[in-house]
């Protein structure tokens, strides 16, 4: 297994992996090829894919606003899970964010995503007592359930 920086050329394979991963929370704007291109241009050194025999089996998007890091869409192909691939992708993302001077990382997970919540909790991500996450859509977004 090899981990490398994600390229826009990986989009079709990565998107297919996301579609086949439960609880991803995709949408037609941010997760379109144009949306991912914009994200990769802004965060060229913090997004990674895992490959096995030249096939993408895992992915993580991460980036920052200069103060805090965010991790999005960590996914590993179902048949490749429980082998440390998710951990390795997360470690690469966190090290890349540290390298850019980021000291705190956030992740957003759906409440009903039990497997996802267990994964993040096991890795030290906590639900902060002092804050509430709020969101407002400022464009018409079509959500894609996985």
Protein language model regions, located:
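A short, internal acetyl-CoA/4′-phosphopantetheine-binding micro-motif in the GNAT/acyltransferase core
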Residues: 74-81, 109-110
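Conserved GNAT acetyl-CoA-binding A-motif
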Residues: 97-109
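A short beta-loop-alpha structural element at the N-terminal edge
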Residues: 2-14
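Conserved beta-strand-loop-alpha-helix junction that forms the acyl-donor binding cleft
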Residues: 107-116, 135
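A short helix-loop-beta-strand connector motif used in the catalytic cores of GNAT acetyltransferases and
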Residues: 37-49, 70
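Conserved beta-strand in the GNAT
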Residues: 49, 55-63, 70-75
């Amino acid at each position: 297994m090899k981990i490398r920086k994600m390229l826009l050329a990986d989009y079709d394979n990565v998107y297919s992996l996301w579609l086949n991963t439960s609880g991803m929370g995709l949408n037609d704007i941010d997760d379109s090829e144009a949306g991912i291109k914009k994200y990769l241009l802004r965060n060229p050194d913090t997004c990674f894919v895992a490959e096995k025999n030249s096939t993408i089996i895992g992915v993580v998007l991460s980036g920052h606003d200069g103060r805090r890091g965010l991790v999005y869409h960590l996914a590993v192909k179902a048949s490749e899970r429980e082998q440390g691939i998710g951990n390795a992708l997360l470690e690469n993302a966190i090290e890349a964010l540290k390298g850019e001077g980021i000291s705190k990382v956030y992740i957003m997970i759906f409440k009903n995503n039990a497997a996802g919540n267990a994964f993040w909790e096991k890795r030290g991500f906590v639900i902060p007592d002092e804050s509430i996450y709020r969101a407002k859509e400022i464009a018409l977004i079509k959500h894609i359930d996985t």
